[in-house]
């Protein structure tokens, strides 16, 4: 075996591994399990990014739905779930037939398991607000994050917003539908849905553009008309937890929740009327075993649910010490594979 050949293999494998992070910082998909990928079951080159809301729905870009072909939701544990329905905002195009409010929603038949939650924000945003965009663009199987800053609203079409992405971390194909997320009151909140990127031909500076949640809030509440909540939650060592949920109802609602092997001991959800897009909390207590918090008959938060290995991904492993940076195969196993290949060729 010649050393130069082995060196070339090592170099090529390192390059392949680094490709998974060239568009941003790799993040642990299992820790951001409300981010999902929308796939075409027969063409793996067609995909978009989406965010789970309200148990079995996901919000994404309208053109991901309109262009057709995406019929599978891929979860963080690599499970593939068929889509059961799709919607596009009624104002997807304007009076001139141009693409306008580029937001869509898809659903699956049953609620899926996820702990991480990003709430929907309909507030006006300020210039230079730090934000992140997490998507699968350019990597497919690993989730990456681009750090950005909110730039401005379109001068005429106020529903379109822009973000400065910089040169080192920027969006690319496959990031369509990703959430633009800010940190607000200790929560991650989505202010817009990613639609695409722009490059200034004079300065070569990159920017991203998206559609605000504020501009499609009626579409969201008409489609969902329910609670936005994590479907999984755990109690602490004392058997207690505080769970934050958000109303995506069409009208004001009041608390109707109850527990099975879970006791509601307080929280702001008990205080009265809850308006659309407002958040509230439930304080719960349990004996540490599995139970359920029922927001309604069909909207359930599983408490202390055992993690089941579905045979894909991390099998629900929430350990953040993984060294494979989002699912990329480690260098040494790949190198050994290359050595074995060379031996076969000799």
Task: Describe each region flagged by the PLM.
Residues 20-31, 41-44, 69-114:
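Conserved catalytic-core segment of clan PA serine endopeptidases
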Residues 330-346:
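A cross-kingdom C-terminal cell-surface attachment/processing module
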Residues 35-55, 177:
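A conserved glycine-rich beta-strand in the N-terminal activation segment of trypsin-fold
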